[in-house]
Amino acid sequence: QVKSIVKILARYQGETKLFIVPFGEIQKKISMNLEVPAKLRVVLYRRLMFRIAEKIAWFSKSKGLVTGESFGQVASQTLNNMVAIDNAVDMPVFRPLAGMDKADIINDSRVIGTHDISALPCTDTCSLFMPKSPEVSAKLREVEEAEMMLKDMQSWINESLEEKEIVK
């Protein structure tokens, strides 16, 4: 699905490289760590995803990260959670859809041809390791304390980057 969506988006953004990074094992390790509050898992997943994305961005000589997030779509997309997630990286994070209405985003996805692909059933790792009650208003201090319980976090990031696949 992702490869098909990237092909469509490449029509609008020029040269595109897709970096596929294995992340399921990292999520599994976080979810199995009993010292980490379950409600903070999603924010921690996103912080590690952003750290990995930042390393790829530096490697690619990019100046920032761009996401398709919109406020309030899912638990991780609240202002407090986005602030806690963004704090994990040093480069700017751009969210061009942040203030758009969900119906407008869906309509635009139909216009450019990504909607039907996005709507196909797919088991993503986020849903596999989703806590019952994810935090919707994370406090940065609590997130950083929970993250300190992830002793091997840097090695997980490095291992994921070593296994990345680049699709042009």
What are these regions (language model features)?
Residues 16, 62, 82-91, 112-168:
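Peripheral terminal appendages
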Residues 1-111:
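ATP-dependent adenylation/nucleotidyltransferase module used to activate substrates
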